[in-house]
Amino acid sequence: QNWPSPKVPP
């Protein structure tokens, strides 16, 4: 998925 935050797993 395309998350807004870079600290979360894809």
Swiss-Prot record:
One of its GO terms (biological process) is regulation of blood pressure. It comes from the Eukaryota. Expressed by the venom gland. The keyword ATP-binding does not apply. One of its GO terms (cellular component) is extracellular region. GO terms for molecular function: peptidase inhibitor activity; toxin activity. Keywords: Hypotensive agent, Metalloenzyme inhibitor, Metalloprotease inhibitor, Protease inhibitor, Pyrrolidone carboxylic acid, Secreted, Toxin. The modification Pyrrolidone carboxylic acid is found at residue 1. Its main location: secreted. It is found in: Secreted. Belongs to the bradykinin-potentiating peptide family. This peptide evokes transient hypotension (-11 mmHg) similar to that evoked by 0.5 ug of bradykinin, when injected alone into rats. It has a high bradykinin-potentiating effect (113%), when 60 nmol of BPP-10e are coinjected with 0.5 ug of bradykinin into rats. It inhibits angiotensin converting enzyme (ACE) activity with a K(i)app of 16.21 uM. This is Bradykinin-potentiating peptide 10e. It comes from Bothrops cotiara (Cotiara).
